[in-house]
């Protein structure tokens, strides 16, 4: 694998330059124009590797599909079931102006800046890997042509599709169907999110996420003149939150977080309305469904208050599977070939 290391080293500086430009181009979620500009810049970089770009319009900003050939004559525009999908996103959580306060910089071998890891670094890394593979493929083809090697399927010759969405940080509402369609048509999906911990462990399991809003409708009243005629919506949700706090189970990895509560108008008025925002996570679809069933069955403690629940599943869990275990084993084998120890981890963060 000395050839691979040499190919990576040959293009590392170019990949870092792309990475820097992409980080300096701010792309907060919802800034459609900024996301479209970055999408075209990223597409141009991959077009230099003979990928073809397609832009799928969406309210959040265009999603970018980049299609590469398979090395055996398949056209890029064809449906290539069984290929590999590299999945990423263009948007970041940072508001516009962050780059001025936290500019791109390199210090002690580390790089800093808004979105430098999540996930413009992942996109740059994909570009570098594919550029290195292109060198290896060209070297293999030259060896065959000169008779110094026998014909073989060149490294990385599987059909590769890259999907970069514009709304991941806000829940992927507009890109979900597209992502699922491309993923189902693929042999494997590699997500370009940062690895786990300092060693960059591969994330082979993720918790699923469900988001809910509990709304309480009570009755307003003057706190000094007619207190007992009122029905306190905030108190109702405080009681509900206290109950939900007992649903988390550390041993099973189930968490139910009451993260935001809003309500009331002023201190001397019994609040008639309030809402509670709940984030629920679990390792399995079964546990997440059980939480949703329980939340939807909640009833108001105060009979004078009306309680409603909205929301539901945001991201399904990525449970460890036999197929995923096999894919990770392939990654470990590839790592050993170049002297890299690859480990796995599970994370509660969604993607």
What are these regions (language model features)?
Residues 83-85, 111, 187-191, 213:
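Short glycine-aspartate micro-motif
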Residues 1-114:
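Acidic/His- and Gly-rich active-site-bordering loop/insert found
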Residues 119-144, 149-205:
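Acidic/histidine-rich catalytic neighborhood of metal-dependent amide-processing enzymes
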Residues 20, 43, 124-131, 176-179, ...:
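Predominant activation on well-ordered alpha-helical scaffold segments within soluble catalytic domains
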Residues 107-118, 341-345:
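Short pre-catalytic strand/loop immediately N-terminal to key active-site residues, enriched for Gly-Thr
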Residues 91-107, 190, 205-215, 333:
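Acidic-glycine-rich active-site phosphate/pyrophosphate-binding loop
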Residues 111-124, 231-234:
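Short, conserved micro-motifs enriched in small and acidic residues
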Residues 1-3, 10, 27-28, 55-57, ...:
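Metal-dependent amide/peptide-bond hydrolase catalytic core
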């Amino acid at each position: 694998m000395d050839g691979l290391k040499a190919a990576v080293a040959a293009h590392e500086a170019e990949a870092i330059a792309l990475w820097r430009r992409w980080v300096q181009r701010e792309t907060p979620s919802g800034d459609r124009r900024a996301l479209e500009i970055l999408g075209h810049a990223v597409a141009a970089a991959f077009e230099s590797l003979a990928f073809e770009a397609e832009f799928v319009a969406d309210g959040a900003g265009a999603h970018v599909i980049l299609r590469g050939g398979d090395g055996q004559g398949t056209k890029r525009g064809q449906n290539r079931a069984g290929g590999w999908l590299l999945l990423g996103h263009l948007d970041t959580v940072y508001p516009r102006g962050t780059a001025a306060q936290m500019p791109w910089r390199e210090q002690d071998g580390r790089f800093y800046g808004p979105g430098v890891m999540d996930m413009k670094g992942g996109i740059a890394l994909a570009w570098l890997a594919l550029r290195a593979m292109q060198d290896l493929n060209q070297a293999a083809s030259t060896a065959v042509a000169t008779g110094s090697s026998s014909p073989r399927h060149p490294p990385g010759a599987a059909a590769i599709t890259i999907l970069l969405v514009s709304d991941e940080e806000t829940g992927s509402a507009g890109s979900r169907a597209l992502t699922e369609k491309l993923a189902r048509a693929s042999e494997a999906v590699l997500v370009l999110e940062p690895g786990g911990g300092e060693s960059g462990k591969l994330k082979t399991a993720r918790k699923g996420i469900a988001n809910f809003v509990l709304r309480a409708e009570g009755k307003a009243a003057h706190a000094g003149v007619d207190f007992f005629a009122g029905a306190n919506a905030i108190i109702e949700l405080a009681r509900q939150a206290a109950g939900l706090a007992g649903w988390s189970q550390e041993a099973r990895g189930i968490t139910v977080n009451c993260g935001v509560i809003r309500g009331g108008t002023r201190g001397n008025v019994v609040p008639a309305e309030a809402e509670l925002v709940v984030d629920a996570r679990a390792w399995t679809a079964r546990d997440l469904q059980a939480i949703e069933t329980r939340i939807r069955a909640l009833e108001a403690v105060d009979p004078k208050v009306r309680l409603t629940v909205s929301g539901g599943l945001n991201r399904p869990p990525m449970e460890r599977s036999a197929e995923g275990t096999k894919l990770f084993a392939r990654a470990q084998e590839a790592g050993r070939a170049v002297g890299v120890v690859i480990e796995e981890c599970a994370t509660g963060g969604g993607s």
